[in-house]
Regions:
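Active-site-proximal segment of RNA-dependent polymerases
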Residues: 3, 13-16, 103-163
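Non-catalytic, polymerase-adjacent accessory regions of viral genome-replication enzymes
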Residues: 1-55, 396-404
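Amphipathic alpha-helical blocks
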Residues: 46-70
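Conserved polymerase palm-domain catalytic core
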Residues: 141-269, 273-288, 373
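Short, conserved non-catalytic motifs in the polymerase core
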Residues: 38-44, 69-94, 111-124, 195-246
């Protein structure tokens, strides 16, 4: 395909798209897939014959005969949530990098609202937080007051309840390449859930029932015979799932931004907010969102979804906010995040060198110090100085001193 920008190595410029079996695309995907995991034996073995392996992958993708390798599964506790994560082999990560970076992301990007900040180059959680601050300040500038409300929306088990049939219909609007759609369907099919334990009546209505992958882990494996599969659920940690996660609620975002004309609206994966001067308007907006979400097969968590006054203290993406009557936006870190960080520091200090521990702490501190009080900053810096004495280098030097 023609590269109008003549930038052979710049895949994120999106001046063109390459086929998923393009040799250059696979090589660049290989470099991205192994980044940060070169130390793993599996990756090192692949590197020894990577040209032969990439050639094989290229041929199998072109002939549509590629088969995914078995994945690993583990449970991750993060930010107070327990999630089931699946790890992919290096070959599968390369293939999914090519699919997402060369086809899905460029195809979907133009249909996303600007304030959708997840899993996109140049965006992220920091981008979404900055946009929220911008929206709050613009709201105050327009209304000269903090009298207003914010609707905070959360979905129940978002990735667990993404329906495969709806996702494929959505993607077919943006992607027309035969090979890409074949690979996407193959990827989605891997996420099907064995529900052989269900009765015929339960199986008939399973797509309309909230699915929880954590509870699913407790089911007796002997009941999972492979006779019935549910076309719902995506694996967290899968790059395709991340792209699907930002594209799946496009109908909701278009409803809020275009149909309802809400200017101060943003999204980060399954967390979103809408700011308006009328509480009644936000209540009606929520009803519309719940209806559209239901048609997509996802469920709004009404226990966590709430409407708050802008002048009250409310939390979004683990930070507490409040808009004062002078237009100042107060930000405070979630105390639970500080507690988790202190525990992590105590656990890692004996396992890291002093430089590694310092880099780890400073990178975290730089991102959070502005939303911490002086008391909180002093406390965590005191702990850091104390723990530096028990890092790996410090302990080894003490042992050498005692030995001499």
């Amino acid at each position: 395909m023609v590269n109008a920008k003549h930038d052979t190595f710049c895949y994120d410029s999106e001046g063109y798209q390459r086929e998923i079996f393009d040799g250059n695309a696979l090589f660049e995907a290989y470099k991205r897939a192994k980044k940060g995991s070169d130390w793993k034996p599996q990756v090192q073995r692949f590197e020894m014959t990577y040209l032969l392996e990439l050639s094989r992958i290229q041929r199998e993708l072109q002939e549509m005969t590629y088969e995914f390798l078995p994945s690993t599964q583990f449970v991750l506790n993060e930010r107070g949530k327990t999630r089931v994560i699946r790890g992919e082999q290096i070959q599968d990560r390369i293939v999914k990098h090519t699919l997402c970076d060369e086809v899905l992301n460029p195809a979907v990007k133009n249909f996303l609202i600007y304030d959708n900040g997840a899993s996109l180059v140049g965006k992220g959680i920091a981008f979404t937080r900055k946009r929220l601050l911008t929206h709050l300040r613009r709201y105050y500038a327009q209304h000269h007051s903090n009298d207003g409300y914010i609707l905070l929306i959360d979905f129940s088990k978002y990735y667990d309840n993404i329906r495969h049939d709806i996702l494929m219909e959505l993607m077919k609007k943006y992607v027309t390449d035969e090979h890409s759609l074949w690979l996407l369907q193959k990827t989605v099919d891997r996420s099907k859930v064995d529900v052989s334990y269900m009765s015929d009546d339960e199986y008939e209505n399973c797509l309309d029932i909230l699915f929880n992958s954590l509870l699913y882990q407790e089911i007796d494996q002997r009941l999972l015979t492979g006779k019935k599969f549910m076309g719902k659920h995506l694996n967290i940690g899968d790059q395709v799932a991340q792209t699907a996660g930002i594209a799946y609620p496009i109908p909701i975002d278009n409803f809020v931004k275009i149909v309802k004309g809400v200017k101060f609206y943003g999204r980060y994966m399954d967390d979103s907010y809408a700011i308006h001067e009328s509480k009644e308007f936000l209540e009606e907006l929520l009803k519309g969102i719940v209806e559209i979400a239901g048609s997509l097969g996802i469920t709004v968590n009404l226990k966590k979804t709430r409407i708050c006054k802008l002048s009250d203290h409310w939390r979004f993406l683990q930070i507490q906010y409040s808009l004062t009557d002078t237009g100042r936006v107060i930000q405070k870190i979630n105390p639970k995040r500080l507690t988790a960080m202190r525990r992590k520091m105590k656990k890692l200090a004996p396992k890291l060198t002093e430089k590694e521990f310092t880099d780890f702490f400073r990178s975290w501190f730089k991102n959070h110090y502005k939303i911490m009080s002086r008391y909180q900053r002093n406390n965590i810096e005191t702990l850091f100085n104390q723990l530096k004495e028990v890092t790996l280098c410090s302990t080894q030097s003490d042992l050498q001193t005692e030995g001499s």
